[in-house]
Design a protein with these regions (language model features):
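Local sequence-structure signature of Cys/Sec-based thiol-disulfide redox active-site neighborhoods
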Residues: 1, 8-46
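N-terminal leader/targeting and pre-domain segments
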Residues: 1-17, 106-121
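Thiol-based oxidoreductase modules, predominantly thioredoxin-like and allied folds used
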Residues: 5-6, 23-26, 44, 48-63, ...
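Extracytoplasmic/secreted envelope proteins and their assembly/folding machinery
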Residues: 10, 37-41, 60, 94, ...
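Extracytoplasmic/periplasmic, Sec-exported soluble proteins
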Residues: 28-35, 55, 66, 89
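Thiol/disulfide oxidoreductase modules built on the thioredoxin-like
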Residues: 63-71, 85-92
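Acidic, Ser/Thr-rich peripheral helices and adjacent loops at domain boundaries
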Residues: 71-79
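Non-catalytic, surface beta->alpha helical segment in thiol-disulfide oxidoreductase systems
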Residues: 78-137
Length: 137
């Protein structure tokens, strides 16, 4: 079961690199931002995603556009539609980043509903699927 989850998560994230990008908002002197940058470099090397680092003080309008007030903050953006979703505020581990991206990609692609946020694809229609027991289907 764990192997299926990991494979599904990695395939989804890898497939998202052409559709999505990450923006990390930082500030000069932010030690947590430096820690997050190291984690993002590992993520970039593993998945090949585009990641842009934005200094909030230098680009306050961009921070305001995404309603960012703290650093580090990571936002996922759909390169085609421009829609975005917050991924983290503060430092997030590589495993938590991967899980959050997996869920966010599926949600933004319309593959899951908010009720199915905590599910993996192979669980759809089974006992863990909250929509299996509702009229929402």
């Amino acid at each position: 079961m764990v192997a299926i989850r990991v494979r599904e998560q990695e395939e989804t994230i890898a497939s998202g690199r052409n559709q999505f990008a990450l923006i990390m908002f930082t500030r000069p002197g932010c030690e947590f931002c430096e820690s997050q940058q190291s984690i993002l470099e590992f993520f970039i090397n593993k998945y090949g995603w585009p990641v842009r680092t934005v200094d909030m003080d230098e680009y306050p309008n961009m921070a305001a556009k995404f309603d960012v007030t703290m650093t580090p903050t990571i936002i996922m953006v759909d390169k085609n539609s421009g829609k975005s979703m917050p991924i983290s505020i503060g430092v997030i581990s590589m495993s938590d980043l991967a899980l959050k991206l997996y869920r966010s990609i599926r949600y933004m692609r319309g593959e899951i509903t908010p009720q199915q946020w905590f599910m993996h694809d192979f669980e759809k229609g089974k006992s863990n699927d909250p929509l299996k027991y509702t009229e929402i289907q």
